């Protein structure tokens, strides 16, 4: 039996088939994505593997369908039901801004217009006590009116429901009994945190995605059933865990950024296999460049993420769910180079995407992209694109890049390298955002480069950041899909709990955590996870008294009855605050605002097969004809290597190009690449 993972990207759809033991992938496929119907690309990628679906026990899927729907605004009509007096929470938002000094700042546009934000009677106070009964007649009347006006989905977010969810649950039950045609989402099924604006934004996004994700997943399940797939379809969540297709249809907001998460799972697993604790994941695909961190062998998460769209402005829409901490910028192989009104050259964030794609694809694209520039520079070989399965035309690439060279009256090669010289520092800056701006020195980390376009730029980025160790993973173009096969089951639980740290009762805290874990244990048992594979991770959100934001602290395994436990929490918060913000106030009073439990159902660990060992010098059959490559302002004669024929212990000295079916690695002068026992390339300065 085998395990299958399929990852939909903005440009390509990747599939990996792995044996049951979790060793090296058996089969890989990479084909262009199909934006008109993403499920078609999934099926095509499976068919390309030429493996019978009835031999596959599990199918894990990472998708960008929900993310793309939000960005593009392709929603079905939805409405918001909220407590009387809170109709404009979505419009008021928060007073803080990403950039306080932007004179052209614009607030996010509400995701639901005011005429579809409806108030209903009923009230619960902040202690969870009902002060006014839910007005059922008012609810029915207003829902009926909304449906008559074409509303297909309802989001319900009532004030203080995090403290008592009975009104939301009652409203949902009444609507489903009386109006079965409309889909309903309530905020407390997603999160029980305070922060009214963020909770409202989250449930609204969930409601907007209900129809889209239901239609997509039902269609996909029908197609894979036709291929005789006997198992369950599982999806990657934004928190890095697995969820069933049934749950994804109910809470689709958890699939946002699902397609990006596989990469960090792969980086974490690779680190564990190689014995590395601290890594930077650098994923460059066709549309974006994504940065993630693994610190102490675990990936970083954030209690809330934001998604930016044309209507959200620079702040983005908040989504109040735990998520892998990913920083993405619009720099990928398909990113378009363009000149602004001041004659400055930019790269991205606009992308040629899968259709029409870079000019070299010959599918109607005419604008110069990063891929076109690399073809012009000789860093990519046209005949080797996707192993020769996809035809690209270097002349089309030259014609596109010539727009830039003609504008600046410069040589074609200089213009092409100019595009790369803008793209690479932009990606380095994205890594600085995740490291330097948080008090972390990237030079202390190992950078793991993957994605189809990643290895081509990895050495350039590392040189910019003075990172001396870079790993180019095996199967870089399918690395994220492989990472999905390493995912565990995971659900996150959050409970608002506001308490001064000095007054904290450890027995009460233990009781609250135990209650959450009891609920989580029952859920995992129902999903067939054995007790021996269950793991619970406790965290608390803490802030200085009077602050409006909190930091999340992982709790140690020390018994809560330990007398030094509160002091340890206090000290660790001060240390994290100093690292993150460059200041702290150890003598300032602190308060806990939320308790968190990550319930994890561990799956079978993955491993990698080793490759044959050779001498320091690569064998002759690993050599391909040399060619001139434009690097650092001049043409250089570069040795070209076939990565599939390299052996462990081989060493390659730059400048050189290492080619494989789905990616190409550029090695600069004064750098050396060593092949390890698994086939990874370790790039270091000579």
Task: Pin down the residues of each PLM region.
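N-terminal glycine/serine-rich phosphate-binding loop of ATP-dependent small-molecule kinases
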Residues: 1-78, 125, 132-155, 168-187, ...
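Conserved phosphate-binding loops in N-terminal lobes of ATP-dependent enzymes
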Residues: 5-8, 12-16, 27-28, 32, ...
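C-terminal, non-catalytic interaction/recognition modules in large multi-subunit enzymes and RNPs
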Residues: 8, 137, 141, 145, ...
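Glycine-rich phosphate-binding loop of actin/hexokinase-like ATP-binding domains
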Residues: 15, 20-34, 79-85, 105-108, ...
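Conserved short loop/turn motifs at secondary-structure junctions
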Residues: 54, 155-164, 206-209, 416-422, ...
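Glycine-rich beta-strand-to-loop/alpha-helix junction loops that act as flexible
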Residues: 63, 157-159, 187-189, 238-239, ...
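Terminal amphipathic helices with adjacent charged low-complexity linkers/tails
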Residues: 157-203, 207, 384, 555-559, ...
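Metal-dependent DNA phosphodiester-chemistry modules and their immediately adjacent helices/loops
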Residues: 188-224, 482-511, 515-516
